[in-house]
Amino acid sequence: MSVVLVDLGYGNIGSIAVAFQRLGATVTLTADPAEIEAAERVALPGVGAAGYAMGRTDALGLRETLTGLTKPLLGICLGMQLLFEGSEEEDTACLGLIAGKVRKLEPAPGLTVPHMGWSRLDVTDASCGLTNGDYVYFAHSFACDDGPASIATARHGRTIPAAIRQNNLLGAQFHPERSAEAGARFLKAFLAC
């Protein structure tokens, strides 16, 4: 099985590549639209700011490529957020593949922003490789609206989608490459879908 990692020129792409390679996948890092379109599976990793990420996406001419994909596309952390319509972060228009907006997490007594660390999942669709009670690792300050695409949630002041699925799209707000066995199961399920 092969997977193309969309290389926007920053982020946690190396650790994601290693996580896929440990599962036996052949990994290609590229920003070439033709290579992305020819891939069996595509992953859009990301850390950082939505505005910068969408600026890089547009500068590399990848918006149309990504929005036109019909093969499995996995968004990881910021990459998942980019699948939605827009983000409050820098009032950014995103790819618009999933209805909803990305909103800033609000600090509260006992809760810090960014949300960093391990959180327990409530899973409604185990076909993604996750199970109820799994703990996965988060590092984020913004989260998507909870909606029909949500297949696993966590709590951090509010219910946040930890994983989403819609048509050919799969997303993880958490970092599967840092989430031990649960993260490996999630990536393995993506490779098998």
Regions found by a protein language model. Name each.
Residues 48-115:
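Cysteine-nucleophile active-site neighborhood
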Residues 39:
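An anion/phosphate-binding loop that grips the pyrophosphate of nucleotide cofactors and donors
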